[in-house]
């Protein structure tokens, strides 16, 4: 549990993020204090200013595959993202999305506002973002690829 005193795990997570990784904080809702503690640990490795911000309605998660109107809030808590190096590096959902996607979904009042179809669409969009975290930077290789194809 990265909320605990396991500093090595937080350091590994920060190293993963710095190397281009993406992670989702799954499970129970993360408090502001939890996110601040995690951010402090990530800051030590990344050596940059990091801040969790609400996911805006025009974010790439809203349109990476399915077109979504909004991400569901729980008790007024919005989904939050951590930007690093010009990309979304971490996501803190306000619901337990994976609980809805299990064979026998377990829901809390927060998850009950979503249908399984809506949860699946959100999950697919998150996967698309996570698999193409820095596709814009990868476009620098496009001229070389096109040259080889000619």
Model-derived regions, located:
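Short, flexible loop/turn segments with low-complexity composition
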Residues: 136-146
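An acidic, glycine-rich "communication" segment
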Residues: 26-124, 149
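Detector for methionine-enriched segments
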Residues: 17, 62, 127-128
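Oxidoreductase and adenylate-handling cofactor-binding alpha/beta cores
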Residues: 123-133
């Amino acid at each position: 549990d990265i909320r605990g005193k396991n500093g090595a795990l937080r350091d590994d997570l920060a190293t993963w993020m710095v190397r281009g990784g993406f992670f989702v904080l799954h499970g129970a809702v993360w408090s502001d204090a939890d996110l601040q503690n995690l951010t402090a640990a990530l800051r030590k490795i990344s050596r940059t200013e990091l801040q969790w911000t609400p996911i805006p309605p025009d974010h790439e998660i809203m349109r990476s595959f399915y077109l979504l109107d909004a991400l569901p809030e729980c008790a007024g808590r919005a989904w939050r993202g951590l930007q690093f190096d010009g990309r979304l590096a971490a996501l803190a959902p306000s619901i337990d999305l994976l609980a809805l996607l299990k064979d026998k979904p377990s829901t809390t009042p927060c998850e009950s506002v979503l249908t399984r179809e809506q949860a699946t669409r959100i999950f697919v969009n998150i996967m698309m973002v996570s698999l193409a975290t820095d596709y814009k930077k990868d476009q620098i290789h496009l001229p070389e690829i096109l040259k080889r194809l000619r």
